[in-house]
């Protein structure tokens, strides 16, 4: 799993979980990942670009996997700002990612095709009622 080495650090506390999940995906020859809730990724601090490791960096890790296996990552987020930011820090994977600005429930209802791995990580944290209605 050398293709994930850039993501293995002490701040990425969910790395081992992602690594184990993707090992299983490789064994099963999975190529299609669908993710609800796009990682926000890099943040700008003065002139430094820093990764926001609190997100777990799911979007770039799944994109790296998609590149490795010749697959595709479909990711959706209700926030256009999050999608646009993710597009910037994953630009080298653009042929392996399809971004969608959409409510996750609506996105999944309309998704056509096989899903090998479904990663549910969307939440309306600012609105607990909307989050409970999502039930994701």
Model-derived features: positions:
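A short alpha-helical cap/connector motif
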Residues: 1-136
């Amino acid at each position: 799993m050398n293709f994930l080495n850039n993501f293995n650090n002490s701040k990425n506390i969910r790395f081992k979980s992602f690594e184990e999940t993707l090992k299983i995906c490789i064994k099963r020859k999975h190529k299609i990942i669908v993710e609800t809730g796009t990682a926000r990724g890099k943040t700008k601090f003065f002139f430094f670009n820093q990764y926001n490791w609190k997100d777990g960096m799911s979007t770039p890790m799944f994109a790296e996997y998609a590149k490795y296996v010749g697959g595709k990552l479909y990711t959706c987020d209700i926030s256009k700002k999050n999608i646009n930011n993710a597009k910037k820090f994953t630009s080298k994977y653009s042929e392996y990612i399809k971004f969608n600005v959409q409510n996750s429930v609506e996105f999944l209802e309309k998704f056509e095709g096989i899903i090998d791995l479904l990663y549910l990580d969307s939440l309306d944290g600012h609105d607990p009622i909307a989050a409970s209605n999502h039930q994701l």
